[in-house]
Amino acid sequence: MEVVILAAGQGKRMRSVLPKVLQPLAGKPMLSHVLDAARTLAARRICVVYGHGGEVVRERLDAADLAWARQEPQLGTGHAVQQALPHLTDGDLALVLYGDVPLIGVPTLQRLAAAAGDTRLALLTVELDNPTGYGRILRDAAGRVVRIVEEKDASDAERRVREVNTGILVAPVARLRAWLGSLRNDNAQGEYYLTDIIGMAVAEDIEVVTVQPDAVSETLGVNSKPQLAELERIHQRNIAQRLMEDGVTLIDPARIDVRGELVCGRDVEIDVNCVFEGRVELGDGVRIGANCVVRDARIGSGTRVAPFSHIEQTVMGPACVIGPYARTRPGTELGEDVHLGNFVEVKNSVIAAHSKANHLAYVGDADVGQRVNIGAGTITCNYDGANKFRTVIEDDVFIGSDTQLVAPVRVGRGATLGAGTTLTKDAPPEQLTVSRAKQLSIAGWKRPVKQR
């Protein structure tokens, strides 16, 4: 099977300079969702028909498995599919999808293709309580589809029909090529309607069959920001439902956003207003507190992430305790039972098992050993204004509060750094290292008085 994706719409109602099919849904362009469905079907060829802002679309999403066809000017859906014909092979089937219908499901498309077989024209239709704006499916007395009439061309009786065309169809490429070559634009819009091929199929005694989607939401298109927001909520509810069916506890399934892939072990609990981006893996028994953002991370079993923490491109071992208000940045690796408390930031660092930085610290470009205690206010000074340098802290080190480690520097195994130390040279193992100005008490000193 070959797939044609129509993605040339202008999207004026979006009121955006970004082409409509690039508007984000669940963290990626709408068109990407449709491409994912086509790829899951193992389509032999995928052709994207682009128009408005097309070069931007192509630059953003171009890939080796995609063909591109430009529609200029834009003269309707039939004209759009015509532009893809040079990329299609007679003897195969063509599936027509839409770049602004992002929730179409693969099982639905598989049933549609099966219904088409090798010779039939298969249409995806839905029944709506309010079919305003959609082309109506017209059937004869025997229930056979005879044609589709667009709403602007429909009579009052035809407008009362509730079964509507979604635009998604499967047809033999050879027949599609012939039908499209016979299209006329003598209609209210002066456009070449793809739907007119149904009448041609009926006239040629080609069987026209219909399939209903698993959910109406699969066929909903997006023309405005409110509609985009509606589909976002539908999509997130579907994700939340699947997570709960897999055993994840969601404190409120209406308040989670997954903008990528979330893989969870057993007995995972996620509190409200959490956002997961990219690929995130949560081990057994992981608990994520409220208002956390987790991006491209792997979190080990039994780890607890307290509220308002941000985790990005991080690997965490089991039984860690993170937050609240902690931040791990790209390149962070945490061993077992690592504690990062409130207002601790870690970047591009490896922290080994059982080490702790419980509050108010910055650990950047560092290698931290096991059982290290990092006191409040500790900073690894890793940047000299031009280059980054690493800090090495060996096992069993105790770092007092308000300590600065000016990289490159090494703290030996079992060393203790006194509070307030500014370390500019390596600290030897098993020794106390302190660098402080001598404490003075000045007798008779008085605070300045504000002049009147």
Swiss-Prot record:
Annotated positions binding UDP-N-acetyl-alpha-D-glucosamine: 6-9, 20, 71, 76-77, 98-100, 135, 150, 165, 223, 329, 347, 362, 373
Top enzyme category: transferase
Residues the record lists as binding Mg(2+): D100, N223
InterPro entries the record matches: Bifunctional_GlmU, GlmU-like, GlmU_C_LbH, Hexapep, MobA-like_NTP_Trfase, Nucleotide-diphossugar_trans, Trimer_LpxA-like_sf
Region (N-acetyltransferase): 247-452
Reactions catalysed: alpha-D-glucosamine 1-phosphate + acetyl-CoA = N-acetyl-alpha-D-glucosamine 1-phosphate + CoA + H(+); N-acetyl-alpha-D-glucosamine 1-phosphate + UTP + H(+) = UDP-N-acetyl-alpha-D-glucosamine + diphosphate
UniProt protein name: Bifunctional protein GlmU
Organism: Azoarcus sp. (strain BH72)
